[in-house]
Amino acid sequence: MPEKHAWTRWFWGVMGACALAQLVLAGATAGYAADYNTFWAWALRVAEEGFSGFYAEGYFADYPPGGILLLWPLGKLAQLLHISHASAFARCLLAAPGILAGMGLAALCYRLAGPGRARGFVLGVAAGASPALLYVTGVWKQMDMVYLLFLVACFAALGKRRLFAAALCWGAALALKPQALILGPVLAVCVLADAWYSPK
């Protein structure tokens, strides 16, 4: 039991350090300018117009409603506190959903591999501290980690034959990015296979 607690403490210590590093990177770097400016424009628009007025004819917005939903509280907070989108705080704010999702993804991998064990620690840290993912979130301020969290949760649920939970996670991923459609056939095959091989 003490060893299990030690692995858990080490895991969350590393994840906390990764989150702090991403916040520092987010505040110190400008991000991918085209996406950064677009995300903040969308955040402020949905905060001002609401969801019913966001997707107006002639207005460019190629993200599904789930992605805009993530931006809505950021826009509201920016309005409330009069935050300039060019400030370091605004950069950290935009990176926050991805950072939190990254910690959630790492925790999910840690649990799937066996919490309190070396393999769980290794897999969780490999997922949450991947340099590529840290760069995408901390430097580019993308929210791909939120999308990825739901996809991994979908496959984790499929592995346990929890089809309804898997469908919900896939639907959440699809609401964030249409690329989740690629995995639709995989989910369909799993559902059909479960129905076919279930005891009659």
Which stretches of residues belong to each language-model region?
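Short helix- or helix-capping micro-motifs
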Residues: 18, 123-131, 170, 174
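Perimembrane helix-loop-helix junctions
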Residues: 1, 183-200
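Transmembrane-helix signature of polytopic, membrane-embedded enzymes
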Residues: 109-131, 160, 164-165
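Short acidic/glycine- and proline-prone juxtamembrane loop motifs at membrane-interface regions
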Residues: 138-146
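Transmembrane-helix motifs of polytopic, lipid-linked glycan transferases
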Residues: 92-116
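Specific aromatic-rich, kink-prone transmembrane helix
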Residues: 108, 146-163
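Extracytosolic helix-loop segments that constitute the early lumenal/periplasmic catalytic or substrate-binding loops
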Residues: 35-62, 66, 76-83
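Start-transfer (signal-anchor) and selected internal transmembrane alpha helices
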Residues: 1-24, 111-123
